[in-house]
Amino acid sequence: MFQAAGAAQATPSHEAKGSSGSSTVQRSKSFSLRAQVKETCAACQKTVYPMERLVADKLIFHNSCFCCKHCHTKLSLGSYAAMHGEFYCRPHFQQLFKSKGNYDEGFGRKQHKELWAHKEVDSGTKTA
């Protein structure tokens, strides 16, 4: 019956016939009702809401859950060090790993140089 003018024409509209046979114009709402993805904290596995969300090394945390693995001190984005998915305050990171000079040894893993030594021994025995 009537037509929208100007920028309103870009808005999608649907025609519906009333019981009297006359057509009416209904505009869809400009916002969508998309389902929001629930993000979970990497430390406590509970839902993280936008106001308490913190992202470090592509992992999502609550502000209160982002703490040192060794002393449980609350960390900030400028005061942490990460190793193999674990987060530490800088003093404990240095205490636990830097003094040894080998990060893998601090985690109980084989040293990188040992992995190379095994490959050389294996390749030497196969050629003989």
UniProtKB/Swiss-Prot annotation:
Chain positions recorded as Zn(2+) 2 binding sites: 68, 71, 89, 92
SUPFAM superfamilies (UniProt xref): Glucocorticoid receptor-like (DNA-binding domain) (SSF57716)
Region (Disordered): 1-25
Subcellular compartments: Cytoplasm; Nucleus
Binding of Zn(2+) 1, residues: 41, 44, 62, 65
An example molecular function term from Gene Ontology annotations: metal ion binding
One GO CC term on file: nucleoplasm
Domain named LIM zinc-binding: residues: 39-99
Pfam families: LIM (PF00412)
Matching InterPro entries: LIM_LIMD2, Znf_LIM
Alphabetical keyword list: Acetylation, Cytoplasm, LIM domain, Metal-binding, Nucleus, Zinc
Modified residues annotated as N-acetylmethionine in this record: 1
Major location category of this protein: cytoplasm
PANTHER family on file: OS06G0237300 PROTEIN
Assembly notes: Interacts with ILK.
Annotated function: Acts as an activator of the protein-kinase ILK, thereby regulating cell motility.
Protein name per Swiss-Prot or TrEMBL: LIM domain-containing protein 2
Organism encoding this protein: Mus musculus (Mouse)
